[in-house]
Amino acid sequence: EHEGWLASLRNNPHTRIWAILFKGKIQGAVSLTAIDLKHKTADWAFYLSPETQGKGVGGIVEFKLLELAFGEMGLEKLNCEVLVTNPQVIKMHEKFGFRLEGTRRANILKDGLRRDVALLGVQAHEWQEARSRFTRLYGTQ
Protein backbone atom coordinates (compact mmCIF):
# COMPACT_ATOMS: atom_id res chain seq x y z
CA GLU A 1 0.00 0.00 0.00
CA HIS A 2 2.76 2.48 0.92
CA GLU A 3 4.74 1.57 -2.19
CA GLY A 4 1.73 2.37 -4.36
CA TRP A 5 1.28 5.70 -2.62
CA LEU A 6 4.97 6.57 -3.09
CA ALA A 7 4.79 5.56 -6.76
CA SER A 8 1.75 7.79 -7.25
CA LEU A 9 3.70 10.72 -5.81
CA ARG A 10 6.65 10.10 -8.11
CA ASN A 11 4.34 10.15 -11.12
CA ASN A 12 2.32 13.19 -10.04
CA PRO A 13 3.55 16.37 -11.78
CA HIS A 14 1.66 18.51 -9.26
CA THR A 15 3.43 17.19 -6.15
CA ARG A 16 7.03 16.95 -4.96
CA ILE A 17 8.05 15.60 -1.56
CA TRP A 18 11.48 15.39 0.07
CA ALA A 19 12.71 13.85 3.31
CA ILE A 20 14.48 16.14 5.77
CA LEU A 21 17.72 14.59 7.00
CA PHE A 22 19.32 15.85 10.20
CA LYS A 23 22.33 14.17 11.78
CA GLY A 24 21.92 11.21 9.45
CA LYS A 25 18.28 10.50 10.29
CA ILE A 26 15.01 11.36 8.58
CA GLN A 27 13.53 14.04 10.83
CA GLY A 28 10.69 15.36 8.71
CA ALA A 29 9.37 16.11 5.26
CA VAL A 30 8.91 19.09 2.98
CA SER A 31 6.45 19.21 0.10
CA LEU A 32 5.27 21.28 -2.81
CA THR A 33 1.68 20.49 -3.76
CA ALA A 34 -0.89 21.98 -6.13
CA ILE A 35 2.01 22.84 -8.46
CA ASP A 36 0.51 24.84 -11.31
CA LEU A 37 3.10 25.56 -14.00
CA LYS A 38 0.62 27.57 -16.08
CA HIS A 39 0.04 30.08 -13.28
CA LYS A 40 3.48 29.46 -11.71
CA THR A 41 2.09 28.79 -8.22
CA ALA A 42 2.28 26.05 -5.60
CA ASP A 43 1.46 25.31 -1.98
CA TRP A 44 4.21 24.23 0.36
CA ALA A 45 4.45 22.66 3.79
CA PHE A 46 6.96 21.02 6.06
CA TYR A 47 7.02 18.93 9.19
CA LEU A 48 9.91 18.52 11.63
CA SER A 49 10.12 15.91 14.37
CA PRO A 50 9.86 17.40 17.88
CA GLU A 51 13.52 16.64 18.64
CA THR A 52 14.59 18.65 15.57
CA GLN A 53 12.44 21.71 16.23
CA GLY A 54 14.17 24.83 17.54
CA LYS A 55 17.57 23.91 16.09
CA GLY A 56 17.48 26.13 12.98
CA VAL A 57 16.54 23.29 10.65
CA GLY A 58 13.23 24.93 9.69
CA GLY A 59 15.03 28.04 8.45
CA ILE A 60 17.42 25.99 6.33
CA VAL A 61 14.51 23.99 4.87
CA GLU A 62 12.55 27.16 4.06
CA PHE A 63 15.55 28.84 2.43
CA LYS A 64 16.37 25.81 0.27
CA LEU A 65 12.73 25.33 -0.75
CA LEU A 66 12.32 29.00 -1.73
CA GLU A 67 15.56 28.87 -3.73
CA LEU A 68 14.30 25.80 -5.61
CA ALA A 69 10.75 27.07 -6.15
CA PHE A 70 11.66 30.57 -7.34
CA GLY A 71 14.93 29.56 -9.01
CA GLU A 72 15.06 26.21 -10.76
CA MET A 73 11.28 25.73 -10.96
CA GLY A 74 10.51 29.31 -12.04
CA LEU A 75 7.47 29.69 -9.80
CA GLU A 76 6.17 33.18 -9.05
CA LYS A 77 3.97 32.57 -5.97
CA LEU A 78 4.01 30.15 -3.03
CA ASN A 79 1.23 29.67 -0.50
CA CYS A 80 1.16 27.97 2.88
CA GLU A 81 -1.16 27.42 5.82
CA VAL A 82 -0.23 27.56 9.51
CA LEU A 83 -2.35 27.03 12.61
CA VAL A 84 -2.77 30.41 14.30
CA THR A 85 -1.78 28.66 17.54
CA ASN A 86 1.75 28.38 16.05
CA PRO A 87 2.90 32.02 15.96
CA GLN A 88 6.61 31.06 15.88
CA VAL A 89 6.20 29.46 12.46
CA ILE A 90 4.10 32.37 11.18
CA LYS A 91 6.88 34.77 12.25
CA MET A 92 9.51 32.59 10.61
CA HIS A 93 7.59 32.62 7.31
CA GLU A 94 7.21 36.41 7.54
CA LYS A 95 11.00 36.77 7.90
CA PHE A 96 11.31 34.95 4.57
CA GLY A 97 8.94 37.43 2.89
CA PHE A 98 5.59 35.71 3.39
CA ARG A 99 2.60 37.94 4.12
CA LEU A 100 -0.62 37.12 5.90
CA GLU A 101 -3.33 36.92 3.24
CA GLY A 102 -6.26 35.74 5.31
CA THR A 103 -7.63 33.33 7.88
CA ARG A 104 -9.76 30.23 7.55
CA ARG A 105 -11.83 30.35 10.70
CA ALA A 106 -12.35 27.12 12.66
CA ASN A 107 -10.93 25.18 9.72
CA ILE A 108 -9.05 22.40 11.55
CA LEU A 109 -10.13 20.10 14.38
CA LYS A 110 -7.14 19.66 16.71
CA ASP A 111 -7.18 18.39 20.28
CA GLY A 112 -10.98 18.41 20.18
CA LEU A 113 -11.18 22.12 19.32
CA ARG A 114 -11.83 23.98 16.08
CA ARG A 115 -8.70 25.97 15.13
CA ASP A 116 -8.16 28.91 12.80
CA VAL A 117 -5.61 28.58 10.01
CA ALA A 118 -3.52 31.52 8.79
CA LEU A 119 -3.09 31.75 5.01
CA LEU A 120 0.29 33.12 3.96
CA GLY A 121 1.82 33.80 0.58
CA VAL A 122 5.04 35.08 -0.93
CA GLN A 123 5.73 36.29 -4.47
CA ALA A 124 9.08 35.80 -6.18
CA HIS A 125 9.98 39.50 -5.93
CA GLU A 126 9.18 39.51 -2.19
CA TRP A 127 11.49 36.51 -1.72
CA GLN A 128 14.23 38.33 -3.63
CA GLU A 129 13.88 41.30 -1.26
CA ALA A 130 14.16 39.04 1.82
CA ARG A 131 16.74 36.65 0.35
CA SER A 132 19.86 38.69 1.02
CA ARG A 133 19.31 38.35 4.79
CA PHE A 134 19.74 34.59 4.48
CA THR A 135 22.42 34.00 1.85
CA ARG A 136 25.21 34.64 4.37
CA LEU A 137 23.67 32.06 6.72
CA TYR A 138 22.63 29.39 4.26
CA GLY A 139 24.69 30.00 1.12
CA THR A 140 23.41 30.43 -2.40
CA GLN A 141 22.92 26.83 -3.51
Question: Which residues does each predicted region cover?
Answer:
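Active-site rim helix/loop that mediates acceptor-substrate recognition in acyltransferases
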Residues: E1-T15
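Acyl-donor (CoA/ACP) binding surface of acyl/acetyltransferases
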Residues: I17, L21-Q141
